[in-house]
Structure formats: C-alpha cells, structure tokens
C-alpha cells in the first residue's frame, strides 16, 4: 500500500514537470534585452537566471520521454488493480470486471482506486488511534 501511494505521488510529480511551460530560449532573451536596454542590475540578474533555464529544456525533454514510459506502465498497473478490486469487492467475474474497467475513463479509474485506498488508509489510521 505504501509503495502504491509513493508511486502515485511520483506519477503526479512527473505529470506536473512534464506539463510545465517551456522556458524562454536564448534568442528570445536577447530580444528582450535589446528592447528593454537593461540598466538595472536586478533585470540583468533576472535575464541571467532565464538564460540558465535553457539547460532545463534539455532535461525536460529527457524527463518527458521517461515520464511517458512511467505513465504508461502506471496506467497498466492501475487497470490491473482496478479489475482485481472489482472482482474482490463486487464479487463479479474477471471478464465482467474487465469490461467495466474498459468502459471507465482513466480519471474514473484513478478516482476509484484512490477512494478505495483512501478508505483503507483511514481505517488503519483510526485503528492505531
């Protein structure tokens, strides 16, 4: 259970990274510098910081591809977990559960799993108290 929650948190973190807005390119920074005729030291520091972000674009490309692979595997695992839970919880056959899961969207599957594991975690926490 702990590993599933940690994996889910990592998937959410990688989703935020992959969907973040791309940094400005060095060419755009040069145009901004020419337009504003930087005399203020704070503006120069800000532009220098943005110039360093071009390295992040390369890293984002690497993590974007890695993220897609991780997300694909996580989706497959979630589908299998959802089918197993439906079979166990509702007492239906594996084929019926698979048909129900196939009809659900990815968001609905995530909510179904989070609801189940959230209740389970809450029960364990209340038992410890």
Curated annotation (Swiss-Prot):
Superkingdom of origin: Eukaryota
Q: Which residues form the signal peptide?
A: 1-20
- Known post-translational modifications? Cleavage of the propeptide depends on the processing quadruplet motif (XXXR, with at least one of X being E).
* Locations listed in the record: Secreted
InterPro entries on file? Latarcin_precursor
What does the record's free text say on domains?
Answer: Both the N-terminus (61-94) and the C-terminus (99-129) of the mature peptide form alpha-helices which probably disrupt target cell membranes. The linker region (95-98) probably derives from a processing quadruplet motif (PQM), found in propeptides of many zodatoxins, hinting at a fusion of two originally separate membrane-active peptides.
Q: What is this protein called?
A: M-zodatoxin-Lt8b
């Amino acid at each position: 259970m702990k590993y599933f929650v940690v994996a889910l948190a990592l998937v959410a973190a990688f989703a935020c990274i992959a969907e973040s807005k791309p940094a400005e390119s060095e060419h755009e920074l040069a145009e901004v510098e020419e337009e504003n005729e930087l005399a203020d030291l704070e503006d120069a520091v800000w532009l220098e910081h943005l110039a360093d972000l071009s390295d992040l674009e390369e890293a984002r490309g690497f993590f974007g591809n890695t993220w897609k692979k991780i997300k694909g595997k996580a989706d497959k695992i979630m589908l299998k977990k959802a089918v197993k839970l439906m079979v166990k919880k509702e007492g239906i056959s594996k084929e019926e559960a698979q048909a129900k899961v196939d009809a659900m969207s990815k968001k609905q599957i995530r909510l179904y799993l989070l609801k189940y594991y959230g209740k389970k975690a809450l029960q364990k926490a209340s038992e410890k108290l």
